[in-house]
Amino acid sequence: MSQKGLIYSFVAKGTVVLAEHTPYSGNFSTIAVQCLQKLPTNSSKYTYSCDGHTFNFLVDNGFVFLVVADESTGRSVPFVFLERVKEDFKKRYEASIKNDERHPLADEDEDDDLFGDRFSVAYNLDREFGPILKEHMQYCMSHPEEMSKLSKLKAQITEVKGIMMDNIEKVLDRGEKIELLVDKTENLQFQADSFQRQGRQLRRKMWLQSLQMKLMVAGAVFSFILIVWVVACGGFKCSS
């Protein structure tokens, strides 16, 4: 990762930027706000590309987390950063976010569930959480190997989810219905139960055969001892 990997970050509620940080100068914030106002509503993750930079957005429960990154950084690492910021933000302010009390930043239509009394205007949160954004950016920049491993892990998880969905779609594309899949499952369960019953019967049969063999051996040994005793002692008249 280059030293200029992560450039600018903010947290917004709706279209209102609540906290931001950047160690660089530029018009990143202006472009980011323009992108924010045009975010699609059907996706929780979105990336715009502009002049060798990516504007990466993560949307969660009405809150928008953004990071501007150098295009060479890729998409995985910026979203690992955004997940870290989101979890930290929720951990710090979840109680206030769930508060039903109206907040000065609330929009007319959709911002009913906002913050409590902890901060009354946007710059209070910027002053409080802006330095946290800085810490996360510095940490991610100084731990590229960890970020790379996390991004690969998330990519693998996403790939597995895609494979599972792909497999289901392939089954359905072949014309097999869910009912048939259920029937197959029930049939497999019946076969498993039948196999268990056969296994128990086989073990019982083997146990009986083993017991029979032991009784035969014991009878033979007893008969041999009895014959030796009769020969040696002359039947039942053996004297000391």
Swiss-Prot record:
Keyword Transport recorded: yes
Signal sequence annotation: none
Topology term for the membrane: Single-pass type IV membrane protein
Tissues expressing this chain: Highly expressed in flowers. Detected in leaves, stems and roots.
Domain v-SNARE coiled-coil homology: 149-209
CDD domains: Longin, R-SNARE
Disulfide bond positions: none
Annotated TM spans: 216-236
Location(s), subcellular: Early endosome membrane; Endosome membrane
Domain Longin, first and last residues per copy: 6-133
Chain ranges on the Cytoplasmic side, renumbered to this chain: 1-215
GO CC, alphabetical: CORVET complex; early endosome membrane; endosome; SNARE complex
Assembly description: Interacts with subunits of the class C core vacuole/endosome tethering (CORVET) complex including VPS11, VCL1, VPS18, VPS33, VPS3 and VPS8.
Homology family: Belongs to the synaptobrevin family.
Record's protein name: Vesicle-associated membrane protein 727
Gene encoding the protein: VAMP727
